[in-house]
Amino acid sequence: MRVDLFDFDLPEERIALRPVEPRDHAKLLHVRPGEPFEDRHVYDLFDLLQPGDALVFNDTKVIPAQLEGMRERTGNISQVSATLHMRVGPDRWKAFLRPAKRVKEGDRIRFGHSGTSCFLGTLDATVAEKGDSGEALLVFDLSGAVLDEAIAAVGHIPLPPYIASKRPEDERDRKDYQTVYAREEGAVAAPTAGLHFTPDLLEKIKARGIEEHFVTLHVGAGTFLPVKADDTGDHKMHAEIGHVSQRTASALNAVHERGGRIICVGTTSLRLIESATGEDGVVRPWSGATDIFITPGYRFRAVDLLMTNFHLPRSTLFMLVSAFSGLDTMHAAYNYAIADGYRFYSYGDASLLERIDHDRHSA
């Protein structure tokens, strides 16, 4: 499909730079294909679901993966930024470097030495490989838990570009840009639909007889990369590491067997559950990388509803929601949301989407 089919105009003032407080007071647009849109709030969510349904959350935890460093070469020092996006070994991370043209294989980069001292000593890395789109493989001198502590000491929360271009990261972001149930460290970006949940809302949902299950997908910096291709068939997704346990897979299959619905909180949960589901509609344990790219025409195997924020024009995430609820429906929903003052992107409001075809299909 042509990428320009997923374009729309978004006034800059609709981009949220801070979340609402409390978290669950964000607006929630209920989208049911073929029916009028309904304005709600996130705290209404348990009224929109049914006992026996199951919510699926991504429990990944954002790490301070934005590093500032100096590339040192004989007689030449240059400033370099690195956004870590996938751990591939105890001492190895794939990262996006900026500006990448200043770096070549074999270069040494010293992180955390400009205004911030690394209390564990130097946080240095070697550029082992260079790839496309500014991607590189960094091999650090530190390893394992010691490396994790050093990154936490000198790193910054990698705010999305549309926020970072407007203001710097601060201490409030370390709390705001993290779900209340985050526990598995490794994400570069937050699973933002989950940012709306409070402990009190989670308790109310559970009390209504709605199950809560957790999966892990470490969201990578590739989620911020623009789609540069003119056709969706020419776009390549960056892989992300995920895990679905046997217990969670069995529980979700039981939900469908008794007629309940699976509601994914966020596109990351949806992409992982769909990756773990076979053509027979059975969710299976999963551990590994997924680069699933969902566009209109995809036949969903497991997920019945999706709670998600409002996404960028021409983005893979707007393509995903268009596959889920229909391209025309989503254009209409976004036009409605823009006119009605909904806040967009990571710190913005949310939508609850029902699938355009409520029968589960094989892919």
From Swiss-Prot:
Keyword hit for Aminoacyl-tRNA synthetase: no
Single GO term (MF): S-adenosylmethionine:tRNA ribosyltransferase-isomerase activity
Cellular component terms (Gene Ontology): cytoplasm
First-tier enzyme category under EC: transferase
Top-level lineage group: Bacteria
NCBIfam families: PRK00147.1 (NF001140), queA (TIGR00113)
Pfam families for the chain: Queuosine_synth
Function recorded in the entry: Transfers and isomerizes the ribose moiety from AdoMet to the 7-aminomethyl group of 7-deazaguanine (preQ1-tRNA) to give epoxyqueuosine (oQ-tRNA).
Swiss-Prot/TrEMBL catalytic activity: 7-aminomethyl-7-carbaguanosine(34) in tRNA + S-adenosyl-L-methionine = epoxyqueuosine(34) in tRNA + adenine + L-methionine + 2 H(+)
InterPro entries: QueA, QueA_dom1, QueA_dom2, QueA_sf
Membership in a protein family: Belongs to the QueA family.
HAMAP family referenced in this protein's UniProt entry, alphabetically: QueA
Encoding gene (name): queA
Keyword S-adenosyl-L-methionine carried by entry: yes
Enzyme Commission number, as recorded: 2.4.99.17
Subunit annotation: Monomer.
Subcellular location as annotated: Cytoplasm
Pathway: tRNA modification; tRNA-queuosine biosynthesis
Protein name according to UniProt: S-adenosylmethionine:tRNA ribosyltransferase-isomerase
GO BP term (any one): tRNA wobble guanine modification
PANTHER family: S-ADENOSYLMETHIONINE:TRNA RIBOSYLTRANSFERASE-ISOMERASE (PTHR30307:SF0)
Keyword annotations of the record: Cytoplasm, Queuosine biosynthesis, S-adenosyl-L-methionine, Transferase
